[in-house]
Protein backbone atom coordinates (compact mmCIF):
# COMPACT_ATOMS: atom_id res chain seq x y z
CA UNK A 1 0.00 0.00 0.00
CA UNK A 2 1.32 3.45 -0.83
CA UNK A 3 1.88 5.53 2.26
CA UNK A 4 2.32 9.09 3.32
CA UNK A 5 1.93 11.02 6.44
CA UNK A 6 0.88 14.45 7.48
CA UNK A 7 1.43 16.53 10.50
CA UNK A 8 0.54 19.97 11.63
CA UNK A 9 1.45 22.68 14.00
CA UNK A 10 -1.05 25.21 14.87
CA UNK A 11 -2.22 28.49 16.42
CA UNK A 12 0.11 28.00 15.89
CA UNK A 13 -0.56 25.44 13.49
CA UNK A 14 1.67 23.66 11.14
CA UNK A 15 1.50 20.74 8.85
CA UNK A 16 4.09 18.12 7.95
CA UNK A 17 3.37 15.57 5.27
CA UNK A 18 5.08 12.20 5.03
CA UNK A 19 4.95 10.44 1.68
CA UNK A 20 6.34 7.15 0.43
CA UNK A 21 9.84 7.50 -0.95
CA UNK A 22 8.53 5.80 -4.08
CA UNK A 23 6.36 8.86 -4.77
CA UNK A 24 7.76 11.88 -6.53
CA UNK A 25 7.64 14.09 -4.01
CA UNK A 26 -16.90 18.76 15.00
CA UNK A 27 -14.36 15.80 13.86
CA UNK A 28 -15.93 13.07 11.84
CA UNK A 29 -13.26 10.41 12.32
CA UNK A 30 -13.72 7.69 14.92
CA UNK A 31 -11.61 7.98 18.02
CA UNK A 32 -9.20 5.08 18.21
CA UNK A 33 -8.14 5.68 21.77
CA UNK A 34 -8.56 8.49 24.21
CA UNK A 35 -5.46 9.64 26.02
CA UNK A 36 -5.50 10.38 29.70
CA UNK A 37 -3.08 13.06 30.80
CA UNK A 38 -0.76 11.39 33.29
CA UNK A 39 -1.38 12.37 36.89
CA UNK A 40 1.79 13.47 38.66
CA UNK A 41 2.11 13.70 42.39
CA UNK A 42 5.16 15.91 42.36
CA UNK A 43 4.73 19.26 40.64
CA UNK A 44 8.33 20.05 41.45
CA UNK A 45 9.46 17.06 39.39
CA UNK A 46 7.31 18.25 36.49
CA UNK A 47 8.88 21.69 36.51
CA UNK A 48 12.37 20.25 36.82
CA UNK A 49 11.78 18.07 33.75
CA UNK A 50 10.54 21.10 31.78
CA UNK A 51 13.45 23.23 32.92
CA UNK A 52 16.03 20.65 31.84
CA UNK A 53 15.00 21.02 28.20
CA UNK A 54 14.26 24.77 28.39
CA UNK A 55 17.80 25.94 27.45
CA UNK A 56 17.78 23.73 24.36
CA UNK A 57 14.33 24.96 23.32
CA UNK A 58 15.47 28.56 23.79
CA UNK A 59 18.55 28.00 21.61
CA UNK A 60 16.29 26.44 18.98
CA UNK A 61 13.86 29.37 19.19
CA UNK A 62 16.52 32.02 18.55
CA UNK A 63 18.26 29.95 15.86
CA UNK A 64 14.99 29.35 14.03
CA UNK A 65 14.00 33.00 14.31
CA UNK A 66 17.28 34.08 12.73
CA UNK A 67 16.70 31.69 9.83
CA UNK A 68 13.27 33.23 9.22
CA UNK A 69 14.65 36.76 9.55
CA UNK A 70 17.29 36.09 6.88
CA UNK A 71 14.52 35.15 4.46
CA UNK A 72 12.14 37.90 5.53
CA UNK A 73 13.75 41.35 5.70
CA UNK A 74 10.59 43.34 5.01
CA UNK A 75 7.78 41.13 6.32
CA UNK A 76 6.27 40.60 9.73
CA UNK A 77 7.40 37.44 11.49
CA UNK A 78 5.33 35.38 13.90
CA UNK A 79 5.87 31.78 14.90
CA UNK A 80 5.70 29.38 17.84
CA UNK A 81 9.12 27.76 18.34
CA UNK A 82 7.91 25.45 21.11
CA UNK A 83 5.15 24.13 18.85
CA UNK A 84 7.56 23.36 16.03
CA UNK A 85 10.04 21.71 18.40
CA UNK A 86 7.29 19.64 19.97
CA UNK A 87 6.07 18.42 16.60
CA UNK A 88 9.48 17.29 15.39
CA UNK A 89 10.39 15.75 18.75
CA UNK A 90 7.18 13.74 18.48
CA UNK A 91 8.04 12.69 14.92
CA UNK A 92 11.50 11.61 16.08
CA UNK A 93 9.82 8.79 18.01
CA UNK A 94 9.27 7.08 14.66
CA UNK A 95 12.71 7.77 13.17
CA UNK A 96 15.93 5.78 13.33
CA UNK A 97 19.63 6.16 12.59
CA UNK A 98 20.95 9.40 11.11
CA UNK A 99 17.41 10.70 10.51
CA UNK A 100 16.72 10.38 14.23
CA UNK A 101 19.96 12.05 15.32
CA UNK A 102 19.55 14.93 12.86
CA UNK A 103 16.13 15.88 14.19
CA UNK A 104 17.09 15.95 17.85
CA UNK A 105 20.40 17.69 17.18
CA UNK A 106 18.64 20.20 14.93
CA UNK A 107 16.37 20.96 17.89
CA UNK A 108 19.61 21.83 19.73
CA UNK A 109 19.83 18.72 21.89
CA UNK A 110 23.28 17.24 22.47
CA UNK A 111 22.64 13.51 22.66
CA UNK A 112 25.95 12.89 24.43
CA UNK A 113 24.87 15.17 27.28
CA UNK A 114 21.13 14.56 27.48
CA UNK A 115 19.44 11.18 27.34
CA UNK A 116 16.64 10.86 24.81
CA UNK A 117 14.24 9.67 27.50
CA UNK A 118 14.94 12.89 29.39
CA UNK A 119 14.07 14.94 26.30
CA UNK A 120 10.70 13.25 25.81
CA UNK A 121 9.96 13.40 29.54
CA UNK A 122 10.63 17.13 29.38
CA UNK A 123 8.13 17.57 26.55
CA UNK A 124 5.62 15.35 28.35
CA UNK A 125 5.73 17.52 31.47
CA UNK A 126 5.85 20.72 29.41
CA UNK A 127 2.57 19.79 27.73
CA UNK A 128 1.01 18.73 31.02
CA UNK A 129 2.01 22.00 32.70
CA UNK A 130 0.86 24.22 29.84
CA UNK A 131 -2.52 22.49 29.79
CA UNK A 132 -3.24 23.07 33.48
CA UNK A 133 -6.52 25.05 33.75
CA UNK A 134 -6.19 28.68 34.80
CA UNK A 135 -9.02 31.17 35.25
CA UNK A 136 -6.88 34.12 34.18
CA UNK A 137 -4.83 32.67 31.34
CA UNK A 138 -6.09 30.45 28.55
CA UNK A 139 -3.24 28.35 27.29
CA UNK A 140 -4.11 25.03 25.72
CA UNK A 141 -2.19 22.67 23.50
CA UNK A 142 -3.24 19.59 21.64
CA UNK A 143 -2.02 16.85 19.33
CA UNK A 144 -4.20 14.94 16.91
CA UNK A 145 -3.07 11.75 15.21
CA UNK A 146 -5.16 11.00 12.12
CA UNK A 147 -4.60 7.42 10.95
CA UNK A 148 -5.73 5.96 7.65
CA UNK A 149 -8.29 3.27 8.32
CA UNK A 150 -6.22 0.71 6.38
CA UNK A 151 -2.81 1.69 7.74
CA UNK A 152 -0.74 -0.46 10.07
CA UNK A 153 1.45 1.77 12.20
CA UNK A 154 4.06 0.44 14.60
CA UNK A 155 2.22 -0.06 17.93
CA UNK A 156 5.06 1.43 20.00
CA UNK A 157 4.96 4.64 17.96
CA UNK A 158 1.22 4.96 18.57
CA UNK A 159 1.68 4.26 22.26
CA UNK A 160 4.52 6.76 22.66
CA UNK A 161 2.87 9.67 20.86
CA UNK A 162 -0.24 9.17 22.98
CA UNK A 163 1.49 8.76 26.33
CA UNK A 164 4.36 11.22 25.92
CA UNK A 165 2.72 13.85 23.72
CA UNK A 166 -0.89 13.49 24.87
CA UNK A 167 -2.05 12.80 21.34
CA UNK A 168 -5.63 11.89 20.47
CA UNK A 169 -6.03 9.31 17.72
CA UNK A 170 -8.69 9.26 14.99
CA UNK A 171 -9.42 6.82 12.19
CA UNK A 172 -9.85 8.50 8.81
CA UNK A 173 -10.13 7.64 5.10
CA UNK A 174 -7.35 9.57 3.35
CA UNK A 175 -8.46 8.35 -0.06
CA UNK A 176 -11.43 10.70 0.34
CA UNK A 177 -9.10 13.70 0.34
CA UNK A 178 -11.82 16.34 0.69
CA UNK A 179 -13.37 14.69 3.74
CA UNK A 180 -9.95 14.01 5.28
CA UNK A 181 -8.94 17.62 4.71
CA UNK A 182 -12.16 18.81 6.34
CA UNK A 183 -11.59 16.61 9.41
CA UNK A 184 -8.07 17.94 9.92
CA UNK A 185 -9.03 21.57 9.30
CA UNK A 186 -11.99 21.27 11.67
CA UNK A 187 -9.69 19.90 14.37
CA UNK A 188 -7.25 22.78 13.88
CA UNK A 189 -9.97 25.43 13.75
CA UNK A 190 -11.63 24.14 16.90
CA UNK A 191 -8.36 23.85 18.81
CA UNK A 192 -7.26 27.36 17.82
CA UNK A 193 -10.65 28.85 18.76
CA UNK A 194 -11.29 29.72 15.12
CA UNK A 195 -8.04 31.65 14.67
CA UNK A 196 -6.48 29.19 12.21
CA UNK A 197 -8.73 28.06 9.39
CA UNK A 198 -8.06 26.00 6.28
CA UNK A 199 -4.55 25.01 7.34
CA UNK A 200 -4.59 22.14 4.85
CA UNK A 201 -5.36 23.25 1.31
CA UNK A 202 -4.33 20.02 -0.40
CA UNK A 203 -3.76 16.48 0.76
CA UNK A 204 -2.16 13.50 -0.95
CA UNK A 205 -4.56 10.54 -1.26
CA UNK A 206 -1.63 8.25 -0.39
CA UNK A 207 -1.28 9.78 3.06
CA UNK A 208 -1.02 7.19 5.84
CA UNK A 209 -1.25 9.40 8.89
CA UNK A 210 -1.43 13.04 9.89
CA UNK A 211 0.03 14.50 13.07
CA UNK A 212 -1.60 17.83 13.82
CA UNK A 213 -0.46 19.89 16.76
CA UNK A 214 -1.60 23.26 18.08
CA UNK A 215 -1.23 25.77 20.86
CA UNK A 216 -3.80 28.42 21.74
CA UNK A 217 -3.11 31.41 23.97
CA UNK A 218 -5.38 34.08 25.42
CA UNK A 219 -3.97 36.40 28.03
CA UNK A 220 -4.97 39.52 29.92
CA UNK A 221 -2.46 42.24 30.71
CA UNK A 222 -1.81 42.78 34.41
CA UNK A 223 -1.86 46.49 33.56
CA UNK A 224 -4.26 46.99 30.65
CA UNK A 225 -4.54 50.06 28.45
CA UNK A 226 -7.64 52.26 28.35
CA UNK A 227 -9.51 51.88 25.07
CA UNK A 228 -10.37 55.59 25.15
CA UNK A 229 -6.67 56.47 25.03
CA UNK A 230 -6.03 54.62 21.76
CA UNK A 231 -5.40 57.08 18.94
CA UNK A 232 -4.33 56.91 15.32
CA UNK A 233 -0.61 57.56 14.97
CA UNK A 234 2.20 57.14 12.45
CA UNK A 235 4.25 53.95 12.23
CA UNK A 236 7.47 54.30 10.25
CA UNK A 237 7.91 51.08 8.28
CA UNK A 238 11.10 52.36 6.66
CA UNK A 239 12.57 55.65 5.46
CA UNK A 240 10.09 55.85 2.58
CA UNK A 241 6.96 54.29 4.10
CA UNK A 242 4.74 55.54 6.92
CA UNK A 243 1.37 54.00 7.80
CA UNK A 244 -1.42 55.01 10.18
CA UNK A 245 -2.09 52.56 13.01
CA UNK A 246 -4.23 52.51 16.18
CA UNK A 247 -1.70 53.21 18.92
CA UNK A 248 -2.43 52.27 22.53
CA UNK A 249 -1.25 54.86 25.05
CA UNK A 250 -0.68 54.76 28.77
CA UNK A 251 1.21 56.93 31.24
CA UNK A 252 2.38 54.74 34.09
CA UNK A 253 5.05 52.53 35.61
CA UNK A 254 6.56 49.90 33.33
CA UNK A 255 9.38 47.37 33.39
CA UNK A 256 11.20 49.45 30.82
CA UNK A 257 14.80 50.44 30.21
CA UNK A 258 17.22 51.25 27.42
CA UNK A 259 19.77 48.47 26.94
CA UNK A 260 23.02 49.96 25.64
CA UNK A 261 24.38 46.53 24.69
CA UNK A 262 21.46 45.93 22.33
CA UNK A 263 20.99 49.62 21.45
CA UNK A 264 17.31 49.06 22.18
CA UNK A 265 14.44 49.89 24.49
CA UNK A 266 13.33 46.75 26.34
CA UNK A 267 9.78 46.51 27.71
CA UNK A 268 8.45 43.61 29.78
CA UNK A 269 4.68 43.37 30.16
CA UNK A 270 3.21 40.65 32.34
CA UNK A 271 0.03 38.80 31.59
CA UNK A 272 -2.12 37.78 34.53
CA UNK A 273 -0.74 34.37 35.63
CA UNK A 274 2.54 32.99 34.27
CA UNK A 275 3.28 34.63 30.91
CA UNK A 276 5.41 37.66 30.10
CA UNK A 277 5.69 39.57 26.83
CA UNK A 278 8.99 41.14 25.79
CA UNK A 279 8.89 44.07 23.36
CA UNK A 280 12.29 45.20 22.08
CA UNK A 281 12.56 48.45 20.11
CA UNK A 282 15.96 48.93 18.43
CA UNK A 283 17.51 52.31 17.88
CA UNK A 284 17.52 53.62 14.33
CA UNK A 285 19.53 51.30 12.06
CA UNK A 286 20.12 48.70 14.79
CA UNK A 287 17.45 46.12 13.90
CA UNK A 288 19.76 43.56 12.30
CA UNK A 289 22.29 43.97 15.09
CA UNK A 290 19.55 43.22 17.61
CA UNK A 291 18.45 40.10 15.72
CA UNK A 292 22.02 38.78 15.66
CA UNK A 293 22.73 39.50 19.34
CA UNK A 294 19.53 38.35 21.04
CA UNK A 295 20.11 35.13 23.02
CA UNK A 296 18.58 33.18 25.87
CA UNK A 297 21.23 34.58 28.21
CA UNK A 298 20.22 38.17 27.46
CA UNK A 299 16.55 37.29 27.83
CA UNK A 300 17.29 35.70 31.20
CA UNK A 301 19.05 38.86 32.41
CA UNK A 302 15.99 40.94 31.54
CA UNK A 303 13.88 38.67 33.74
CA UNK A 304 16.37 38.58 36.61
CA UNK A 305 16.78 42.33 36.91
CA UNK A 306 13.79 44.44 36.04
CA UNK A 307 13.84 48.21 35.72
CA UNK A 308 10.54 49.75 36.85
CA UNK A 309 10.31 53.29 35.54
CA UNK A 310 7.69 55.81 34.53
CA UNK A 311 6.99 56.37 30.86
CA UNK A 312 4.40 57.53 28.41
CA UNK A 313 4.16 54.32 26.40
CA UNK A 314 2.82 54.06 22.84
CA UNK A 315 2.30 50.49 21.59
CA UNK A 316 0.42 49.57 18.39
CA UNK A 317 -2.68 47.40 18.36
CA UNK A 318 -2.16 44.70 15.80
CA UNK A 319 -3.06 41.34 14.39
CA UNK A 320 -0.27 39.59 12.53
CA UNK A 321 0.28 36.10 11.22
CA UNK A 322 3.02 34.03 9.69
CA UNK A 323 3.02 30.98 7.43
CA UNK A 324 6.28 29.14 6.86
CA UNK A 325 7.62 26.22 4.86
CA UNK A 326 9.83 24.59 7.46
CA UNK A 327 11.70 22.38 5.00
CA UNK A 328 14.24 25.03 4.05
CA UNK A 329 14.36 26.68 7.49
CA UNK A 330 15.05 23.43 9.32
CA UNK A 331 17.38 22.31 6.57
CA UNK A 332 19.62 25.23 7.49
CA UNK A 333 19.63 23.88 11.06
CA UNK A 334 20.79 20.47 9.87
CA UNK A 335 17.46 18.65 9.60
CA UNK A 336 17.57 17.33 6.02
CA UNK A 337 17.41 13.52 5.85
CA UNK A 338 13.78 13.28 7.01
CA UNK A 339 12.81 15.22 3.86
CA UNK A 340 14.92 13.08 1.53
CA UNK A 341 14.92 9.59 0.04
CA UNK A 342 17.42 8.68 2.77
CA UNK A 343 14.76 9.16 5.46
CA UNK A 344 14.40 6.33 7.97
CA UNK A 345 10.89 6.43 9.41
CA UNK A 346 10.66 2.70 9.94
CA UNK A 347 9.55 3.35 13.51
CA UNK A 348 6.28 4.75 12.13
CA UNK A 349 5.36 1.95 9.75
CA UNK A 350 7.34 -0.95 8.35
CA UNK A 351 5.05 -1.39 5.36
CA UNK A 352 6.79 1.05 3.03
CA UNK A 353 9.60 3.62 3.36
CA UNK A 354 8.35 7.12 4.15
CA UNK A 355 9.77 10.60 3.94
CA UNK A 356 8.55 14.00 5.04
CA UNK A 357 7.23 15.82 1.98
CA UNK A 358 5.87 18.96 3.57
CA UNK A 359 6.23 20.85 6.82
CA UNK A 360 4.12 23.97 7.26
CA UNK A 361 3.69 26.24 10.25
CA UNK A 362 1.07 28.95 10.69
CA UNK A 363 0.66 31.31 13.61
CA UNK A 364 -1.63 34.24 14.45
CA UNK A 365 -1.34 36.92 17.12
CA UNK A 366 -3.59 39.75 18.27
CA UNK A 367 -2.43 42.46 20.68
CA UNK A 368 -4.96 44.94 22.05
CA UNK A 369 -5.67 47.12 25.07
CA UNK A 370 -6.71 44.29 27.37
CA UNK A 371 -4.22 41.73 26.16
CA UNK A 372 -5.82 39.13 23.95
CA UNK A 373 -9.13 38.98 25.75
CA UNK A 374 -11.43 41.89 26.61
CA UNK A 375 -11.87 42.49 30.33
CA UNK A 376 -12.40 45.52 32.54
CA UNK A 377 -9.79 46.78 34.98
CA UNK A 378 -8.69 50.00 36.61
CA UNK A 379 -5.04 50.68 37.37
CA UNK A 380 -3.97 53.26 39.96
CA UNK A 381 -0.26 54.02 40.06
CA UNK A 382 2.00 56.57 41.69
CA UNK A 383 4.04 58.37 39.03
CA UNK A 384 7.27 60.27 39.83
CA UNK A 385 7.05 64.05 39.57
CA UNK A 386 9.79 64.19 36.92
CA UNK A 387 8.66 64.31 33.30
CA UNK A 388 8.57 60.70 32.01
CA UNK A 389 10.04 59.85 28.60
CA UNK A 390 7.84 59.16 25.59
CA UNK A 391 8.62 55.65 24.37
CA UNK A 392 6.95 55.00 21.04
CA UNK A 393 6.96 51.60 19.37
CA UNK A 394 6.37 53.37 16.07
CA UNK A 395 9.00 51.58 13.99
CA UNK A 396 9.97 47.91 13.51
CA UNK A 397 10.45 45.97 16.75
CA UNK A 398 10.86 42.42 18.05
CA UNK A 399 8.75 40.61 20.62
CA UNK A 400 8.41 37.26 22.31
CA UNK A 401 5.96 35.68 24.74
CA UNK A 402 7.53 33.59 27.48
CA UNK A 403 5.96 31.19 29.96
CA UNK A 404 7.67 31.72 33.31
CA UNK A 405 6.54 28.41 34.79
CA UNK A 406 7.98 26.17 32.09
CA UNK A 407 10.65 28.67 30.93
CA UNK A 408 9.49 28.11 27.34
CA UNK A 409 9.42 30.67 24.52
CA UNK A 410 5.84 30.23 23.35
CA UNK A 411 5.89 32.76 20.52
CA UNK A 412 8.43 34.99 18.83
CA UNK A 413 8.19 37.57 16.10
CA UNK A 414 8.95 40.89 14.48
CA UNK A 415 6.58 43.71 13.58
CA UNK A 416 7.69 45.43 10.39
CA UNK A 417 4.29 46.81 9.44
CA UNK A 418 1.28 46.54 11.81
CA UNK A 419 -1.14 46.99 8.91
CA UNK A 420 0.27 43.90 7.17
CA UNK A 421 -1.91 40.94 8.23
From Swiss-Prot:
Record localization: Secreted
Signal peptide: 1-24
Residues annotated as site: Reactive bond: 385-386
SMART domains hit by this protein: SERPIN
Disulfide cysteine pairs (residue numbers): none
Glycosylation sites: 73, 110
Region entry RCL, spans: 376-395
Positions where Phosphoserine occurs in the chain: 386
Function: Inhibitor of serine proteases. Its primary target is elastase, but it also has a moderate affinity for plasmin and thrombin.
Domain notes: The reactive center loop (RCL) extends out from the body of the protein and directs binding to the target protease. The protease cleaves the serpin at the reactive site within the RCL, establishing a covalent linkage between the carboxyl group of the serpin reactive site and the serine hydroxyl of the protease. The resulting inactive serpin-protease complex is highly stable.
Subunit organization: Interacts with CELA2A. Interacts with ERGIC3 and LMAN1/ERGIC53. Interacts with PRSS1/Trypsin.
Descriptive protein name: Alpha-1-antitrypsin
Classification lineage: Eukaryota, Metazoa, Chordata, Craniata, Vertebrata
Gene from which the chain derives: SERPINA1
